[in-house]
């Protein structure tokens, strides 16, 4: 009997972290009849990566053209639209904020940064088109705007396009999301960062992880979308995962881990944690899958717009089901 009890204790010790970390049992929400347009997603990505390329910190004119494009889409969706200054030398840098639903009460915030990275390669400055990082997230944000125009949400929803996430601003007070998070006056139920949602690869071995042992729980093919949060964000992650699972052809995996795990805080959601706001990231896992991360090869033709649309469908399902 003691051996049986000991075996159960060992099993519990191993299973409990796995259940918290991996969340294998989540029921899908009913899907919404309204759907994102893969064609419109591609149109937005191509505009951001070709017409206003590069969108890096040293190309302020292209950043401002991107901001105007985003603002026009938000306005046409019937939102209450404002511009928020991000105080950075050499600006103006602007967050574009769109509000839907009730003008007071708690909010759900969906955010994506519209800037792209630059880097030195062989002592020469190079620019990425930033299709996956992060024109894909912005395209998702603008499709959400179009869908929210068709049906006003019952809860307050705020869509935010951030001006500055990439280096040299990352992890600084000059991140657009840091400025936005510090300015909030309404209570926030949930913040979601759309960070690289467009690249998928079904080849064996195409998916990597911060630690090799994670491959015991997660696929080796990069054909899924991930929902990522801290341990204390477990309810938020479950809620978002359930909504994404409403897209039946979309493979969804989730992860709740301590903040020190590499990759867990690699986007704008990290700035909301400082204000005790539940905040999670929806991502294709960035450089753990996409080998053109921050490189010139991050182009529009490499993205899967059907899967991107399924991700947006999941997020709009969440918003329509929130009260």
Swiss-Prot record:
UniProt-annotated location(s): Membrane
InterPro entries assigned to the protein according to its UniProt record, in alphabetical order: M28_fam, Peptidase_M28
Membrane protein topology class: Single-pass membrane protein
GO BP annotations listed: proteolysis
GO MF entries: metalloexopeptidase activity
Predominant subcellular localization, coarse grouping: membrane
Membrane-spanning ranges: 4-24
One Pfam family linked to the record: Peptidase_M28
Key words of the record: Membrane, Transmembrane, Transmembrane helix
GO cellular component: a single term: membrane
Organism superkingdom: Bacteria
Protein name, as recorded: Uncharacterized protein YfbL
Organism: Escherichia coli (strain K12)
High-level lineage: Bacteria, Pseudomonadati, Pseudomonadota, Gammaproteobacteria, Enterobacterales
